[in-house]
Amino acid sequence: MANITRMANHTGKLDFILMGLFRRSKHPALLSVVIFVVFLKALSGNAVLILLIHCDAHLHSPMYFFISQLSLMDMAYISVTVPKMLLDQVMGVNKVSAPECGMQMFLYLTLAGSEFFLLATMAYDRYVAICHPLRYPVLMNHRVCLFLASGCWFLGSVDGFMLTPITMSFPFCRSWEIHHFFCEVPAVTILSCSDTSLYETLMYLCCVLMLLIPVTIISSSYLLILLTVHRMNSAEGRKKAFATCSSHLTVVILFYGAAVYTYMLPSSYHTPEKDMMVSVFYTILTPVLNPLIYSLRNKDVMGALKKMLTVRFVL
């Protein structure tokens, strides 16, 4: 925060201007309503999934514990950007202070990084369940699950603690207009009037590392799962194994694909319009899709939901 204060004193200004989504829309009011509905669906969908996992004894397993953690991250993730964006649209304000911008940046970096590692942990959990079913209760006991989940949150926060202070310490004298709907690192860095090429290279390496470790774990886990499934004699066993993995792979492809575009492709591929559309996808749409993917394609979750609705209807 001291760096942010010095920056503000140096430039004589304190507020950034978020150009946002609504300025480019022909129907900003309609877009606001759509985003608000998506936001409510994301919160309610993930909250219901967490409630089902907590209340139904059949869902008290490591796989569903990690799904509940993913739902918690998604609820926090969409809440970092959407409420402020909608409130600013209603109030007719598009400014964000430097400390507020830094906090938003830290939170979304932490949550995105945590989700990267959580998706890798979920792949490892599927590997142990399918390849070592007899040892699964020991290898993935409750203490191990808590340790792995805590590790995901910690490693995600490392990304936030590394990139946020450096990004916010640059002098911003070129422009204060952020061509984005929230304080994303590339959109803020481009405003600096100092040479950021070294920082951008280091940020690229950091993001490669943040993606490479989870992708390696996911790829290795699913390679071993495929080999194990190939050896199965039971067609029903193969079907069940693929069913439990397909939902997770869908989420991995959606989330990692957007992250690769944002942080690993050269700047020549980027435009403010493309960047915002990709960010809308992984910050707003992904949190609403995840609970649908994990519930509609999962018999246990759908069974728990039907049971809960039946009990409520009877009462």
Swiss-Prot record:
Q: Name one GO cellular component term.
A: plasma membrane
Principal subcellular localisation of the protein: membrane
Cytoplasmic face: residue ranges?
Answer: 54-61, 125-143, 224-240, 297-315
The keyword Plastid appears for this protein = no
| Membrane topology of the entry | Multi-pass membrane protein
User: InterPro entries given for it?
Assistant: GPCR_Rhodpsn (IPR000276), GPCR_Rhodpsn_7TM (IPR017452), Olfact_rcpt (IPR000725)
Superkingdom is: Eukaryota
Biological process GO terms, please? detection of chemical stimulus involved in sensory perception of smell
A GO term for molecular function: olfactory receptor activity
Q: Which residues are connected by disulfide bridges in this protein?
A: 101-193
Which residue spans traverse the membrane?
30-53, 62-83, 105-124, 144-162, 200-223, 241-263, 277-296
For the Extracellular compartment, the record's topological domain ranges are 1-29, 84-104, 163-199, 264-276
Q: Which SUPFAM superfamilies does this one have?
A: Family A G protein-coupled receptor-like (SSF81321)
Entry-listed glycosylation sites: 3, 9
Q: What's this protein's function?
A: Odorant receptor.
Protein name, UniProt field: Olfactory receptor 2T5
